[in-house]
Amino acid sequence: MRMVCMSDVNDELDGSPILEEVLGDALGKLKVFHVKLAAEGEPRGLIGPRDVGIIWERHILNSAAIVPFIREATAKRQFKTVADIGSGGGFPGIVAAACLPDHQFTLVEPMERRIEWLHECVDEMGLDNVSIVRSRANAVIEAVRGSNGGRKGRGEDAVDLDGNPIPVRHPFAVVTCRAVAPMTKLSGWTLPLLDKGGRLVALKGRSAQEEIVKATKEISKNGGIHPRVVEAEVGPGLEPTHVLMVDER
């Protein structure tokens, strides 16, 4: 009996016009990403076995739902910089970077095997607007705030999990993430990375508004204002997702 390769499993949206409608010019690069995810994502622990036939909707289109919100947040900025915290399998960072080639993305992920995956994806997709840092968020915050917050020299001392200096010295216009942590923790991992007037854009589940209520103190403590949740379209006829946003005062 022949073993079924995960790449042999058809995706429900393969060939759908929804893909081109939502992803536009990024579709070619994201097809490369989809093929790689279908073949390697489950055995490498990046997606669940039940996700293989719904990668387009659950992971790629869901991640792409934040793209309009990133564009809105950077519309008036000269430097369109985005940090993606806890990038994991590339959601939403790899997808958003493919959709926004005029933005510079920094993917932050602590796990070595996921870092290896992200580097492979960037190389195979030909993404030249992505840098990858193997680090936890607090070390990147130290690199940014130590260089820009008046603590002379401390930012230069910040190192990644391989002991290398973290090549980040400026706060970001936008910070993104998906399924990383509740807002009580996420506030302290993301908001300190934002430039003045920057914006956190996080993909969340149905409990997003409850998370805001529980994290009111943490959001304010870390300089966040105007926390809100909006329903974001994933694609025509598909279930929408939720985007949680917080501005940096």
Curated annotation (Swiss-Prot):
Its EC number is 2.1.1.-. InterPro entries: rRNA_ssu_MeTfrase_G, SAM-dependent_MTases_sf. SUPFAM superfamilies: S-adenosyl-L-methionine-dependent methyltransferases. Its main location: cytoplasm. The keyword Cell wall biogenesis/degradation does not apply. Keywords: Cytoplasm, Methyltransferase, rRNA processing, S-adenosyl-L-methionine, Transferase. It holds the Pfam family GidB. Specifically methylates the N7 position of a guanine in 16S rRNA. This is Ribosomal RNA small subunit methyltransferase G. It comes from Bifidobacterium adolescentis (strain ATCC 15703 / DSM 20083 / NCTC 11814 / E194a). The gene is rsmG.
